[in-house]
Amino acid sequence: MEEVLKLKIPASTANLGVGFDSIGMALDKYLHMSIRKIERANWEFLYYSSELEGLPKDENNYIYQTALNVARKYNVTLPSLQIEMRSDIPLARGLGSSASALVGALFIANYFGNIQLSKYELLQLATEIEGHPDNVAPTIYGGLIAGFYNPITKITDVARIEVPHVDIILTIPPYELRTEDSRRVLPDTFSHKGAVQNSAISNTMICALIQHKYKLAGKMMEQDGFHEPYRQHLIPEFNQVRKLSRQHDAYATVISGAGPTILTLCPKEKSGKLVRTLREKINNCASELVTINEIGVKDEVVYLKS
């Protein structure tokens, strides 16, 4: 019998405006992986979607490098593997494609190295590698997650927030915006006054989400001062998306992660008309309705006749 590990790993959106590097939500776009042992010297990567075209198929592959680094950390040896991949998560668009790949690599190392890491331990490891939990936490656990990574203790603490009863619209531009380029425009420091103000906005946003006060939550999301004022000029379509969304009574329009994808939260009864309007008025972008993934990464082992 041939043993195959199958992974279904969700996309994620980070920040929700003012929750910079600490709040994220899993979405129903996925990286699908099928992994099996092979009797060869080198790993084999097979890609079955356009989103993955151009990715390395050798030792420069990020999943390969990450899985081997984890194996070394726990003093185990991984067999040669064949990894089949299919994805509808666009790369470098602010939808957590790198976090999905990272989580996939951790699950591969954990299973084929028989390391026996719990989900909590996988989160700790993922956040230590990534530097913050905003994408990896919802990717692993699903839902809407707030978290903090302490770089001194190297411990990540997370709390789950009830998933908001709203519809999500993604407006995805045709161009990439790499995280390192998007971070380059951010200031190195904030004044104490500015930090206090943004902290107050973030606190209010979280409380409003918990109480299902989505208008208030959206108002807070759109008052972010941590990153959006510095990044909006990198996304020419942003202001028009926000303007159209407000005309359709959306709760908030924010940058998804480092961008350039634009995330809109809106009432369920308004979402269909809004997404059609966005498709018509901003036709160089792909606008679509998505739902919130509440379970995180799904892993299963299947056995096939050899």
From Swiss-Prot:
InterPro entries reported for this sequence: GHMP_kinase_C_dom, GHMP_kinase_C_sf, GHMP_kinase_N_dom, GHMP_knse_ATP-bd_CS, Homoserine_kinase, Ribosomal_Su5_D2-typ_SF, Ribsml_uS5_D2-typ_fold_subgr
A Pfam short name: GHMP_kinases_N
Record SUPFAM superfamilies: GHMP Kinase, C-terminal domain, Ribosomal protein S5 domain 2-like
UniProt entry tagged with the keyword ATP-binding: yes
Its EC number(s): 2.7.1.39
Domain of life (superkingdom): Bacteria
Record's GO cellular component terms: cytoplasm
Enzyme class: transferase
Amino acids binding ATP: 90-100
GO molecular function, a single term: homoserine kinase activity
Keyword Amino-acid biosynthesis: yes
GO biological process, one term: threonine biosynthetic process
Subcellular compartments: Cytoplasm
Alphabetical keyword list: Amino-acid biosynthesis, ATP-binding, Cytoplasm, Kinase, Nucleotide-binding, Threonine biosynthesis, Transferase
Family under the similarity heading: Belongs to the GHMP kinase family. Homoserine kinase subfamily.
NCBIfam families: thrB (TIGR00191)
Function: Catalyzes the ATP-dependent phosphorylation of L-homoserine to L-homoserine phosphate.
Name of the protein in its database record: Homoserine kinase
Name of the gene encoding the protein in the UniProt record: thrB
